[in-house]
């Protein structure tokens, strides 16, 4: 098995989002995808930003500039009917691609304020609501399709009316956002608590606290290869105790974190956790976290 193969993932991994290269799959990659879904039961999702209609799903020959792309999808600025029709076309293209490769759903990376791209769709609250109202008919718990719809990133910007459209809310609870990590970088139980409280306060009018909590997943940034091999960064308990990184790095801390409300969280995970594939043993800290969160019954 090579590090890039899905079958190399830890056995008990419930869900993985593919950030790049998730379309135009070779026969070998299709077989690998089927194998991990069928033999390990792992849900495999496509992942995309939605800064503008067509993001991630525009044919290359039309993705040359904004005007050509918008003409392809039928987007016309300030024309509500045209915009909604273009959104319908975009949602259908996403769904068609997911069904073509039999992915298990879509993970929307929703970062309107921090993704560095000026987006006509994701930076307009009304347009986001329109698009999610359309997309939820194809994917997610409202669609009866059996396909998942999850969202990660700036969860506090997700329209309240759309909260029930998602199977999971993935918090980017990163110790570091990018660049060279500081030697003291870390995360804490209290930060996880506040992230959960934030979305409970936002979505509490349309979902129960238990429903929100059980859909909430916390994730660490494993982009720094050396830190991925060490299981992340420092982890601090609610009482202020900073644990020994060699014993409980942040990835393991997130796995162990239990919400104070007594409800079960959705889970834990990592961005670019594939950097841990070369660990000894492979995915050492991810496996340790899975075992800590869901102890095996002997």
Please state what every model-predicted region is.
Residues 1-298:
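Secreted glycan hydrolases and related glycan-binding modules that recognize and/or cleave
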